């Protein structure tokens, strides 16, 4: 469950290390984002020679949450932390690699590229 001011790890090779959620997209008063939701983020920590720099604003998709995802069979998939993948304005991933597992809930038309790049799909 991600809200404004939440700090997330970055699960791709864009050079960003951590980002802060500045807006949850979708709806005028939407408060929380879960796995598969798109958020606006600001880069808070970045590698020196990465594609992005501190202070830049990007779209991102949430790929892991500590809150977890409830499946129809009743099981719950939870992670140790919150992570996101940076997207461009066309909602395509900026990075060419994804680090760590992602959930099966991302297997929609929009995010198949992220699922195919991920080393593990839970």
Swiss-Prot record:
A single cellular component GO annotation: cytosolic large ribosomal subunit
GO molecular-function term, one example from the UniProt record: structural constituent of ribosome
SMART domains with a match to the protein in the record: Ribosomal_L14
Key words, A-Z: Ribonucleoprotein, Ribosomal protein, RNA-binding, rRNA-binding
Organism superkingdom: Bacteria
SUPFAM superfamilies in the cross-refs: Ribosomal protein L14
Family note: Belongs to the universal ribosomal protein uL14 family.
Subunit architecture: Part of the 50S ribosomal subunit. Forms a cluster with proteins L3 and L19. In the 70S ribosome, L14 and L19 interact and together make contacts with the 16S rRNA in bridges B5 and B8.
Protein name, as recorded: Large ribosomal subunit protein uL14
Organism per entry: Thiobacillus denitrificans (strain ATCC 25259 / T1)
Lineage of producing organism: Bacteria, Pseudomonadati, Pseudomonadota, Betaproteobacteria, Nitrosomonadales
